[in-house]
C-alpha cells in the first residue's frame, strides 16, 4: 500500500493516535486500525488540513464524516474479532468501513447515494482493502443477500432500530446505532440480540444525520 505520506504526515498521524488515547480510547486493535487508515484520503481536499482534527467534517450529498473519537468509540462498542462479518449502514466517505476492515473478516457497507458508494469503493481499492464491499441501497432494509451478520453499525439516526437489521443479526450479535429524532440530540445505543431476549445499553449522547429509507433517485 502506498499512500504518499511524508514524514510530517506520518508524525501527524502518530499525534492523532495519541490524542485518541487521551480521549479515552483503550482498545489497542481499534487504535491500530485507525493508525493504518490514512484519514486525509477520505476528506475533501479543501479540508484536508483538518483531517486529523477531532471534529466532524462535511462530505458530499449533505452528509457528514464523524469526528475520529466518535468513530473510535463506536468501533470499540462493537467488540469486534477477526472472524466477524459486519454490516455498516451509511457508507459516507468510506472511512469507518476502512477502519472496520482491519478488525473484521468481512465488511459490507450500504449507502443510499451512488456517488458516495462509488467514491468509497475507489478509496478501498487504492488502499488494497479486499474484505470490504460497498453497495447502493436502502440501509433500513439491511443487506439480506449477505446476511447474517455478527455486528451491525448504523451511522444515521432513527427513532428505533429497523426490524430488518435485527432480523439479519446473529444471536449474540451487536448493533451500535444512534436513536432519536433527527432534529434533536440522540442517544448512541449498544443492542445485543440474545436467544432469551435482548439487552440495550445507552452509551453517550450524539448528533447524526437521519436514516432515510430508500436509495436516492439522484446523486
UniProtKB/Swiss-Prot annotation:
Gene3D superfamilies: Vaccinia Virus protein VP39. One of its GO terms (molecular function) is protein-L-isoaspartate (D-aspartate) O-methyltransferase activity. It catalyses: [protein]-L-isoaspartate + S-adenosyl-L-methionine = [protein]-L-isoaspartate alpha-methyl ester + S-adenosyl-L-homocysteine. It is found in: Cytoplasm. GO terms for biological process: methylation; protein modification process; protein repair. Catalyzes the methyl esterification of L-isoaspartyl residues in peptides and proteins that result from spontaneous decomposition of normal L-aspartyl and L-asparaginyl residues. It plays a role in the repair and/or degradation of damaged proteins. Belongs to the methyltransferase superfamily. L-isoaspartyl/D-aspartyl protein methyltransferase family. This is Protein-L-isoaspartate O-methyltransferase. It comes from Xanthobacter autotrophicus (strain ATCC BAA-1158 / Py2). The gene is pcm.
